[in-house]
Amino acid sequence: MWKWNVRRWAGARVNISKNRLSVINVGSRYLSTARSPLSKVRNIGIIAHIDAGKTTTTERMLYYAGISKHIGDVDTGDTITDFLEQERSRGITIQSAAISFPWRNTFAINLIDTPGHIDFTFEVIRALKVIDSCVVILDAVAGVEAQTEKVWKQSKSKPKICFINKMDRMGASFNHTVNDLINKFMRGTTTKPVLVNIPYYRKQPTSNDYVFQGVIDVVNGKRLTWNPENPDEIIVDELDGTSLEQCNRCRESMIETLTEYDEDLVQHFLEEAEGDYSKVSAQFLNASIRKLTMKNMIVPVLCGASFKNIGVQPLLDAIVNYLPSPIEAELPELNDKTVPMKYDPKVGCLVNNNKNLCIALAFKVITDPIRGKQIFIRIYSGTLNSGNTVYNSTTGEKFKLGKLLIPHAGTSQPVNILTAGQIGLLTGSTVENNISTGDTLITHSSKKDGLKSLDKKKELTLKINSIFIPPPVFGVSIEPRTLSNKKSMEEALNTLITEDPSLSISQNDETGQTVLNGMGELHLEIAKDRLVNDLKADVEFGQLMVSYKETINSETNIETYESDDGYRFSLSLLPNSDALPNCLAYPLGVNENFLIMEKNGNWDKEWKYQVSFESILNSIIASCIVGLQRGGKIANFPLYACSIKINSDWSVPPDIETPQEILKITRNLIFKALNDLKPEKYNLLEPIMNLDLTIPQSDVGTVLQDLTGARKAQILSIEDESSVSNSGASTCNSPENSNRIYIPSDAVTTLHATKDKKNTQETSSNVKKIIKAKVPLREITTYTNKLRSLSQGRGEFNIEYSDMEKVTNDRLQSILHDL
């Protein structure tokens, strides 16, 4: 009976007494994750709203895995994953950090801790591109918050585990948070929560209050408590009384949920368990939970208090027990849908049935003060060897690799190879100028210089679909203090946007003004800090401003260039529309612009030019980006949602050695096409935000009047907060589901009684309302103080980017006047 618990934390020292089992010195000796078989690898991301406890939970994971000898603390600024000075001084995660560590001596976990602040959404987007599954951390006091809803939608296809954190805090409610989870994410779907463990409260001898001290393990029917004086000590007890009753009800509910989807468990329940819920083996339950989690039919739910070191080891167990390995996860999305892909249990993802084809994605670039530029990559198929010749199928460049590393947040471990499913780092002078975020790398798995043996037309043209970059919504002007500082400013800006592609630079050719654009005020504040303090740029900044764009509402004339030496190009610009037949589309940066190339007859024949098609394509893309940044005729803002169409009759001289002339020709054609377009064919666009407001019912009238009048908002819905969050029921019965999910009620404490009484009073006199609206960003930049005044400090709001929309005629002159 006790063996299972002893094995749960490998390498632990065990003391057994008559009534309890103590597991001491939890953790495991460090093992190189490079040696773990694919089936034992887990690529996970930690996602949540800001301040839910992502970094605190990650630091406990690293401590219990044996990576760190002390527990890092966000408040004291000594965390491993938040290693940037700005992160430690502000106590928030700014950029995603990757780290690899072992668990239970046999599993390797590659973890990416992502930011929770909405301004750093791109860090979450690119992390989701390379992970196989997620751990969603929820605040037990706040429940499901706005950014949690956003990252849940972004990670829709990824298997998930939910960890309800901060169960030790005043006002924490497991019941409320699980109900919130169901009502906001699972209503209208077939997905259900499965409570893997539930909170355990111990009554204090000097009061009537109950204190959160551990969890009840529903699968194994044990109580786990943590010693507050010793972070390494876990006490495992048998259940009795209320704990046993709650566990039995949760186990019955768990089995009822699992058997709706799992026929194997149904058979085990009826035959081997003889219809007795208590006789269903933990082994069968774990297997069923794993199977259904990977199919996104269920979401395992656990709880704890990471700051108090409670519940982290069971969470790590759930990660390796329930989440998929790289050979069980989603296949990567390739540009060529005809290329066969499948999973091989030995080598992982097999592309084009070629075991020697190695494909990797560069998803992040950082600049280390000692090592220089470092590129984070995810290996999807094959094996990457140090010293290999690699082909960048995005740029058409070929180069030799230097060192390979496995990341450990601020540090890294050198390795000779990276295998399918791993996340690693590339360093060295050869990669610095040859790889950018979103590039696909291809090489031969066993030969150092084996590119010639790969299929040139098929395998060397493969690309993993690019990482989506949301458009910036704020900008700040930047200029060097003196003319001599201009070059260093440009170099620093280039480093900045290479590391973070959600930042962009635009330049007004008429005024010479340079503008740094970003996702929000905090995003730009961090970027400015990094420019001045880390990259030592001697610059001055202007005022924060909304990032307006321009677009065209009709197609331009077709402009043509033809020369005697063999160059010919014809192009036009048109508003974005549905995909054009017999054309290929390539994204152009962050402004929803595209290059559309009609298929050229030369593509299906033997390539006759000295330079690769990728080199020609990248020159055209570069000229398109420059041409569109020049701006429109309303206020010279960069162009948005435009397509540049290259006609199929283009040609270049067969003996062309560099694509430099192509860049010049196409750029001039773009300038001419835009210059010939009449001013009335341009529209001004502004960022529109989704606004979520929570306010007392008594303030709805005044808030709505302000929104629709002064702020030009479009109201989408108004509903009771209780209709999207059911707090207090012991069961949740979703209309779409046939069974009732048992959720234990929260322990009755003086605090909860007071809170419940207050909530009852509020419900009877001042119901909370949730208003959803769309509003121009310009009209809401100073909304915090206004809402505080309108709601007497009782209102809360969150905003996130929705889209770019045409500025209405009644507001156009006002906006232009303020520029």
UniProtKB/Swiss-Prot annotation:
Transit peptide endpoints, chain numbering: 1-30
UniProt cross-references to InterPro entries, sorted A to Z: EFG2 (IPR030851), EFG_II (IPR041095), EFG_III (IPR009022), EFG_III/V (IPR035647), EFG_V (IPR035649), EFG_V-like (IPR000640), EFTu-like_2 (IPR004161), G_TR_CS (IPR031157)
Main location: mitochondrion
SMART domains (UniProt xref): EFG_C (SM00838)
Phenotype caused by lack of the gene: Results in loss of mitochondrial DNA. Causes a significant slow growth phenotype under normal growth conditions (glucose) and a reduced chronological life-span (CLS). Growth on a non-fermentable carbon source (gylcerol) is absent.
Gene Ontology CC annotations of this record: cytosol; mitochondrion
Source organism superkingdom: Eukaryota
Molecular function (Gene Ontology), one example: GTP binding
Protein location: Mitochondrion
Keywords: GTP-binding, Mitochondrion, Nucleotide-binding, Protein biosynthesis, Transit peptide
GO BP annotations listed: mitochondrial genome maintenance; mitochondrial translation; regulation of mitochondrial membrane potential; ribosome disassembly
CDD domains the record matches: EF-G, EFG_III, EFG_mtEFG_C, mtEFG2_II_like
Annotated positions binding GTP: 48-55, 113-117, 165-168
Domain tr-type G: 39-327
Coiled coil: none
Primary role: Mitochondrial GTPase that mediates the disassembly of ribosomes from messenger RNA at the termination of mitochondrial protein biosynthesis. Not involved in the GTP-dependent ribosomal translocation step during translation elongation. Required for respiratory growth and essential for mitochondrial genome maintenance.
Any further remark recorded for this protein: Present with 1733 molecules/cell in log phase SD medium.
Similarity remark: Belongs to the TRAFAC class translation factor GTPase superfamily. Classic translation factor GTPase family. EF-G/EF-2 subfamily.
Record's protein name: Ribosome-releasing factor 2, mitochondrial
Organism: Saccharomyces cerevisiae (strain ATCC 204508 / S288c) (Baker's yeast)
